[in-house]
Amino acid sequence: MAALGLSVGLDRPGMAMKIKEIKTYVLEAMLAEPFAYSQAWYERRGALLVEIVGEGGISGWGEAFGPPRLTAPVIDFYTPLLVGADALATDLLWQTLYNRLRDHGQKGLAIEALSAVDIALWDLKGRHLGLPIHRLLGGPLREQVQAYATGFYRKRHGHPLDYLLAEAEERVAAGFSAIKLKLGFGIDDDVRLCQAVRKKIGDGVGIMVDANHAYDAPAAIRLGRRIEELDIGWFEEPVPPEDLRGYQEVKAALSIPIAGGEAEFTRWGFRPLLVERAVDILQPDTCAAGGISECKKIADMANAFGLRVNPHVWGTGVALAASLQLIAALPHNPPALHPVEPLLEFDQSEHPIRMAIIEEPIVQRAGWVEVPNRPGLGIAIDRQAVEKFRIR
């Protein structure tokens, strides 16, 4: 074994750390006012956090995208494979967990749970070594990230144009220089919203749109052609994630950049999007697509194919911190004196848990967010707040 270099240095301080315990936290909070996107109504927000405790009591934290009550049992399944293993061997552990459920969970809940574990392992590694994750990934390429405001959901009461235009003004007044509108409520409705928002906020603010796969390719093309003149930054999830050919048709028909990938998983899942040139912008979610380990691989693949990467984010401060650490290490694509930089998706809709569970909220100033530079994710968890929202 030593001849192969597998045990060299493992007796030195800092070269290994055994995992002592895995803890899961299912969190939930009711919303003051329900809201909807093109697929469903939300009456509550939830989160699944994972805490991995290493030797010496050091903890790392991660978060899983997706339904917390369904993802938690997968973490329970992974736990015996993790306890006693070397927490610093992030890639080895990723492969171990993925291969264990490979025949049953190449996408979906198994990978979302794996994502949370992977993020927690990177947080633990960074805390153990005294470095932020972006330094362990070879960065930073940037120390602050431009954020765009996500929100613009539908409510049960009031006229959508009234409250959505007011929200657009509010986001711009708060300092955001780009916003993302939720579409998928009918082509005419979507066009009216885009036109009204562009007129209200002017040409100096970026507008992206997201249909959350509410259309088929012909409808998405009709919609896209009617809003092309509004200088749309990208058209996100125009068609269902399974419809690769539909993505290609929409991309070929429109001048608006096409974005997608929040409902895709692992490098193998993203490979067809790259090889078939189905999108212009990839959007892996760090808490869903396989964690920091896998999203860095996906980003490097995208770089080789000349595609931009803007990670999807829709979680708590843990998810935001993980995305910021990843974005800080993403390569410029293409490289240039003044390159197009990746953006941070910063959800502005109601989420009682989001910032409550971290001791120092992540904030934007003039539309920019600083990348946390303390060890690991760079955040501290408020355990009292976690217990306040915990239901399991």
Predicted regions and their residues:
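Structured beta-strand/loop patches that form or line metal/cofactor-binding pockets in enzymes
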Residues: A16-W61, F65, E350-I358
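Conserved, mostly hydrophobic/aromatic
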Residues: I19, G57, Y78, V117, ...
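Metal- or metallocofactor-binding catalytic centers and their adjacent structured scaffolds
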Residues: I52-H128
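Glycine- and other small-residue-rich loops at beta-strand/loop junctions that grip anionic moieties
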Residues: E63, L114, K182-G186, N212-H213, ...
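Shared catalytic-loop signature of beta/alpha-barrel
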Residues: A72, R225, D231, E242-A259, ...
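Extended hydrophobic packing segments that form well-structured cores
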Residues: P375-R392
